[in-house]
Regions:
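Extracytosolic ligand-binding ectodomains
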Residues: 2-235
C-alpha cells in the first residue's frame, strides 16, 4: 500500500547543544584530518528517497525497511536538540516499475536514495537518480545478508508499523537514515554531492557513538566520529 511522505524536522545547522542529555562513550581526542568537501547544493531540506520492495516476495522486508527509516527520524527528533531544518522521506516500490520510480524521485529532487537491503544495487543505478547520491543498504548488513532484528529492536520497529510480518532490513534502513543525517551535519549541507563526501566521514574517526544523540554530542566536542548503530561495526 503506498505510504504518504513523512515530513519531520532535524538539526543540521550549528551545533548549539546546550541541554543535550545524551552521553557518548568515552574516547580519545581525535587528530584533525583534512575532510573531503563539495560545493554546497542543498536547499535546507534533506530529502531522502527510498526504493524498497512494497510488493512481491520481499514485501515484508520492504515494510520493515520503511519502518526502520521512520523510526530513525522519530529517534532523531526525540533528542533534546532544537530542530531547525526538515527531512522528508519519500517511499517508492523497488519491485514495481523501477524506471518510473527513479523518474519520480528525480523529479522530486531527492538528495539521497536508499536502496533495498535485500537485493544488489543495479549496475546503472547511479546514472538514473540525477544529482542524488545512491546508497545500497546492503553495505550495512554484516555478512552481506540482512538478519531479523533482535527482540528489543523488533518491538521498536513495530511502534512504527504494528503489522510488520518480518524485520529483515529494518536495522539497515534505520542506520542508513542516521548516517545520512550525520553526513549532512558534518558537511553542513544536504545536497547529494555533500552527502557523498560526508558519508565516509561518519565512520572515519575514533569517537565511537551508537546513536544520533551520542554522535551529535561528539561532533559538538570537535571529535571525529565512528557511528556504530543498530547494525554495529560496518564490515
Amino acid at each position: 500500500m503506498p505510504r504518504r511522505p513523512l515530513i519531520v524536522a532535524v538539526l543540521f545547522g550549528a551545533l548549539a547543544l546546550t541541554g543535550c542529555t545524551s552521553t557518548p562513550a568515552a574516547s580519545p581526542s581525535p587528530t584533525p584530518t583534512t575532510a573531503a568537501t563539495a560545493a554546497p547544493s542543498g536547499d535546507g531540506t534533506l530529502l531522502i528517497g527510498t526504493l524498497f520492495p512494497m510488493t512481491g516476495d520481499n514485501a515484508a522486508s520492504g515494510a520493515a525497511q520503511v519502518a526502520g527509516t521512520e523510526l530513525a527520524v522519530r529517534d532523531i527528533l526525540a533528542e533534546q536538540t532544537t530542530p531547525t531544518q526538515p527531512v522528508q522521506l519519500i517511499h517508492r516500490n523497488s519491485a514495481g516499475d523501477l524506471a518510473a520510480a527513479y523518474a519520480d524521485l528525480v523529479a522530486r529532487g531527492v538528495d539521497l536514495v536508499l536502496w533495498d537491503a535485500t537485493t544488489a544495487l543495479p549496475a546503472d543505478a547511479d546514472s538514473t537518480v540525477g544529482n542524488a547520491t545512491m546508497v545500497a543498504l546492503g553495505d550495512f548488513a554484516n555478512g552481506g545478508t540482512p538478519l531479523a532484528a533482535d527482540k528489543a529492536f523488533t518491538a521498536r520497529l513495530k511502534t512504527a508499523d504494528p503489522g510488520l510480518a518480518g524485520t529483515d532490513g529494518g536495522a539497515e534502513a534505520y542506520d542508513g537514515v542516521v548516517t545520512a543525517a550525520l553526513a549532512a551535519l558534518i558537511t553542513g549541507d544536504d545536497g547529494g554531492a555533500s552527502l557523498a563526501a560526508g558519508w565516509p566521514q561518519v565512520i572515519s574517526g575514533s569517537a565511537v557513538c551508537a546513536s544520533w544523540g551520542e554522535c551529535v554530542f561528539a561532533l559538538a566536542e570537535k571529535q571525529i566520529i565512528d557511528y556504530q548503530g543498530i547494525t554495529g561495526v560496518r564490515s
